[in-house]
């Protein structure tokens, strides 16, 4: 291509006023551009425009120059140049809007950040491409955990294009940010809207899961049960999520006077005591049975739990404490003390309340340390 450049330059120098020189100038700009020499390409096209302003080649050069400036992400410079040579009519505001966005999007898509998109949003407050520009700003900022920047960008998309192609993902991310910021009322309303609008299964599930967690946090137990039932009917539910949802529903049942429903969920969860939900459920099931005077059943539940074992020492210790209550209830205080003393001697050092619970119980049984 270097030989081509030499030839075109020579042609322009030897026949500066000919049609061949004008066409050579266009070819020179194209060769430079195709070989990544954008500054040289700009200079070549500008030379054609300035030397032969009324020619057809000058009009073509303006159009080709546009592509070079878009590639350089320098549409402002393109507009300024056209103004300087009296050709601003060839780049109306609507076209500059489009070109500026194209250049900014290209920069973003090639991994060079969102600065150009942010500049576009500032320069064109009524621009035709504010929706995608804000979406990409939000997406990149969310990935970088810059939630303060991502939230208004996603909010703009959701507010100004509620049914557009970017709306669902923008709403999903907006809700996630609101949840992370503990703005639960706004997040719940957003998740509820997302549940209705979502066409992507993952987004619908995320919406329901968000609603479940917020409802549980706010002790809205009826809502917890309703949303949990919807989630549990889904086919694509990971084992971990299924356990979390079952546990939340059991807790809601228990707090609304539906103990047997809660016990059913705890019983299901207690089959896997490797998980925190399973271990806690095994204990809660036994405690529920004990409180309802099903002492033998509670003992059986505890023995099953103890035999299975669990990595969650706290709930295993609570099971031993409850076992001591069972022995005490039967009048077997010596056995109860043995359980408690053994637990005290073997429970790993911890900042939880197990040791204080043991000491309190031993004191009640008439033995102090």
Segments from the language model and where they lie:
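Acidic, polar-rich low-complexity tracts and alpha-helical solenoid repeat scaffolds
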Residues: 1-369
């Amino acid at each position: 291509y270097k030989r081509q450049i030499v030839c075109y330059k020579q042609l322009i120098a030897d026949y500066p006023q000919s049609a061949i020189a004008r066409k050579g100038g266009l070819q020179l700009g194209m060769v430079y551009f195709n070989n990544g020499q954008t500054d040289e390409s700009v200079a070549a096209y500008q030379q054609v425009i300035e030397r032969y302003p009324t020619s057809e080649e000058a009009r073509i050069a303006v159009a080709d120059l546009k592509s070079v400036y878009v590639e350089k992400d320098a549409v402002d410079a393109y507009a300024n140049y056209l103004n300087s040579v009296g050709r601003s009519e060839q780049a109306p505001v609507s076209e500059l809007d489009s070109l500026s966005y194209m250049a900014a999007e290209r920069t973003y898509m090639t991994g060079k950040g969102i600065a150009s998109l942010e500049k576009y949003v500032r320069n064109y407050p009524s621009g035709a491409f504010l929706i995608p520009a804000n979406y990409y700003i939000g997406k990149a900022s969310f990935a970088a955990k810059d939630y303060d920047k991502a939230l208004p960008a996603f909010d703009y998309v959701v507010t100004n294009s509620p049914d557009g192609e970017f709306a669902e993902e923008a709403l999903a991310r907006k809700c996630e940010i609101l949840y992370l910021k503990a703005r639960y009322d706004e997040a719940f309303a957003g998740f509820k809207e997302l549940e209705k609008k979502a066409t992507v299964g993952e987004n619908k599930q995320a919406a329901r899961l968000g609603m479940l967690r917020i409802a549980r946090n706010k002790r809205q137990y009826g809502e917890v049960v309703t949303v949990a039932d919807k989630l549990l009917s889904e086919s694509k539910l990971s084992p971990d999520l299924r356990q979390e949802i079952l546990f939340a529903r059991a807790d809601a049942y228990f707090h609304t006077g539906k103990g047997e429903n809660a016990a059913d969920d705890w019983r299901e969860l207690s089959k896997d005591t490797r998980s925190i939900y399973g271990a806690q459920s095994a204990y809660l099931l036994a405690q529920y049975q004990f409180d309802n005077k099903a002492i033998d059943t509670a003992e059986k539940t505890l023995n099953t739990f103890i035999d299975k074992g669990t990595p969650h020492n706290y709930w295993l210790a609570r099971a031993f404490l409850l076992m001591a209550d069972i022995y005490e209830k039967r009048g077997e205080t010596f056995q109860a003390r043995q359980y408690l003393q053994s637990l005290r001697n073997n429970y790993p050092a911890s900042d939880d309340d197990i040791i204080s619970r043991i000491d309190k119980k031993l004191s009640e049984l008439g033995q102090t340390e």
